[in-house]
C-alpha cells in the first residue's frame, strides 16, 4: 500500500532541517512536529534549541561510540548526556544551526535518531546482562539488533496510531520487564527445547 504524502513529508524533513540551519532558524509549528521523526524535539519556550533522542538498540554501545558522543556533547550540545528508561540517550541544547552536523556525526558512528519520537516503534530493550548472564537461556542481542535495523529502514513502521514498545528477555537473572511492552518476547524452556513466549498488549504509564 502506498505511503501517505503526510508520512513521506515527515520522514523526509531532513532537507528542511538543513535549510533552517543556514540562518539558525527555529522551526515553525508544523516543522516542530515533523522534526520529531528525526529524533529532534524543539525545547521552546524554555530554550531555542533541540533535544535529540538517540536509538540505542538493547542499550548496547561500543567504546568508540561513547567517546564520540562525549565529544559531540562537549562541542555542540549542553555538555552532558541523559539516559532514558528505554536505554536511549538524550542530548540537549542543540542549536538549529548545529542540527545537521549533529545528525551527521551520530550516523557516522553507526547510531540513529530516526523514529525515536512521535508515533513510531521506540527503542528496543532487553535484559541488561544479555550475552554475559551465566544462566540465561539464550543471548537475545542478535535478535534485537536485527529487528532494530528492519524497523529503522522500513517506512511502514512509522506513523503508527500510537508509540509502540518491544522488549526481549533471554531468561537470565535480570529481566527486561517485557510484559509491560506492546510486544514482549521472553525465552522459556519447555522440556529440552528453548522457545520464545510472546506476550501482547502490555503497557506502562498512561492508559
Question: Model regions: which residues?
Answer:
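Intrinsically disordered, low-structural-confidence terminal and linker regions
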Residues: 1-9
Amino acid at each position: 500500500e502506498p505511503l501517505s504524502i503526510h508520512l513521506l513529508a515527515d520522514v523526509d524533513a531532513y532537507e528542511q532541517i538543513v535549510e533552517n540551519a543556514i540562518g539558525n532558524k527555529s522551526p515553525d509549528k508544523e516543522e516542530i512536529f515533523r522534526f520529531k521523526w528525526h529524533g529532534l524535539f524543539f525545547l521552546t519556550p524554555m530554550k531555542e534549541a533541540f533535544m535529540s533522542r538517540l536509538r540505542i538498540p538493547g542499550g548496547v554501545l561500543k567504546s568508540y561510540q561513547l567517546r564520540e558522543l562525549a565529544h559531540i556533547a562537549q562541542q555542540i550540545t549542553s555538555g552532558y548526556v541523559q539516559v532514558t528508561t528505554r536505554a536511549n540517550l538524550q542530548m540537549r541544547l542543540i542549536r538549529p544551526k548545529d542540527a545537521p552536523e549533529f545528525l551527521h556525526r551520530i550516523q557516522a558512528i553507526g547510531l540513529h535518531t530516526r523514529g525515536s519520537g512521535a508515533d513510531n516503534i521506540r527503542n528496543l530493550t532487553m535484559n541488561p546482562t544479555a550475552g554475559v548472564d551465566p544462566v540465561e537461556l539464550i543471548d537475545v542481542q542478535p535478535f534485537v539488533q536485527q529487528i532494530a535495523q528492519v524497523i529503522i529502514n522500513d517506512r511502514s513502521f512509522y506513523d503508527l496510531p500510537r508509540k509502540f514498545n518491544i522488549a526481549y528477555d533471554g531468561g537470565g537473572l535480570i529481566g527486561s520487564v517485557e510484559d509491560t511492552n506492546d510486544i514482549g518476547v521472553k525465552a522459556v524452556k519447555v522440556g529440552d527445547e528453548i522457545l520464545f513466549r510472546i506476550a501482547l498488549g502490555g503497557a506502562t504509564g498512561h492508559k
